[in-house]
């Protein structure tokens, strides 16, 4: 788990359109093809108000490549159209504990 970077996109969904769905698919594909990509996980809060997309990467270079991806830059311009609110959290995972039966990410 050393050097793992977790990029969380926590958001309250708004109204999605065709452009959103196209960009979302393109960004997911690009992220998954980066050499440092580990996985992506999505969660919904118990009250279904918030969603969290967590992308795990092996290195910060991959995070920076995703941030500079042209389709990602286009999507950032549409956040007010597609989301009621959002927050980005980028963290370095320094430790991971468990019983060994759950492999995450």
Please tell me what each predicted stretch does.
Residues 1-51, 60-68, 84-105:
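Short S/T/G/P-rich N-terminal loop/turn motif that feeds into the first structured element of a domain
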Residues 78-81:
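Arginine/glycine-rich "motif VI" loop of SF2 helicases in the C-terminal RecA-like domain
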């Amino acid at each position: 788990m050393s050097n793992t970077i977790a990029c969380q996109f926590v958001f309250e969904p708004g109204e999605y359109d065709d452009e959103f769905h196209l960009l979302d698919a393109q960004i997911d594909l690009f992220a998954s093809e980066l050499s440092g990509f580990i996985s992506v996980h999505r969660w919904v809060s118990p009250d279904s108000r918030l969603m969290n997309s967590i992308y795990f990467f092996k290195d910060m270079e991959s995070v920076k490549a995703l941030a500079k991806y042209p389709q990602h830059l286009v999507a950032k311009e549409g956040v007010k159209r597609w989301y009621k609110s959002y927050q980005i959290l980028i963290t370095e995972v320094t430790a991971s504990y468990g019983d060994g039966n759950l492999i995450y990410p």
